[in-house]
Amino acid sequence: MAISRDQKPFKVVGVEAPALEELADSVMSMSPNALDADAIAEKARSANLDRNSAGVGGDRTSGEAVESFFDLVIDELAALRTRAEVEAIEQAAGLILECESLGGRVHVTGIGKSEHIARYVASLLSSTGTPAYFLHATECIHGSAGQVCANDIAIAISNSGTTPELLSAIETLRDSGIRIIGVSGNRESELARVADVLLDAGVDNEGGELNLVPRASILAKIYVLCALSVALEVRKGLTREQYARWHPGGALGRKARGE
């Protein structure tokens, strides 16, 4: 999306005027051909990082911190969108369909915050036509690997891709002969190395005053896994009637039935 120099293409909320003017001057000094959404996202992300770092031990208000976080997340997801490989998502969907055709099932696993994502994704996939089961990664090496059978496939989630407990679980799953879809923010990690296909969910900054607590990376992993669910939904031809049958309750169930 090209933007002319006469337009005001963006607003960085939570950045004081001098920093905003510096950002605008930097972006506007770029050649017209380079003045696109991706370049602006990169500049804005840098501004957010500078502002985020300045806030540690600084005097910005909680409202300013929230506004800065909103901007940072938008920038991180925009950057991820430029890197996201549709082919990798399609490949992951293909592996799942292949395993299902052989009678296999989908398991989703992770440690820490990734465990919560795994539980959500298992539920999301199940409600959209791909039965999936949460697998506790720690319990996996203490007997729960027994829920996994030949021709199954596991989605393993780890931001670092180096979490020891998860890697131990993957080794155990590999011994059962199943395939692995990795979801990680580290393309050079051990998880990336052992996975049959890797879905990139990397971010540069988490947001917040410490820039350590998993926030943006959580959203990034959900972002790519929701995209995977969309690919499966389309390839399976999910109908409104099917969804209503699997999700009959609540306002969403009534909406699916057209009530």
What is each PLM-predicted segment?
Residues M1-E42:
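N-terminal acidic, proline/glycine-rich, low-complexity intrinsically disordered segments
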Residues K8, D25-V27, I40-R45, D59-L102:
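An N-terminal, well-structured beta->alpha segment
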Residues A37-A39, A47, A54:
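Ala/Thr-enriched low-complexity intrinsically disordered regions
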Residues G55-S62, F69, T82-E87, V106-H107, ...:
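Short acidic/polar alpha-helix capping motifs at helix-coil junctions
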Residues S62, S101-H107, I111, P248-E259:
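Glycine-rich phosphate/diphosphate-binding loops and the adjacent beta-loop-alpha structural elements
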Residues L97, R105-K236:
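Glycine-rich phosphate-binding loops that contact phosphosugars or nucleotide phosphates
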Residues R193, G207, V234-E259:
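Internal, active-site/partner-interface "lid" segment
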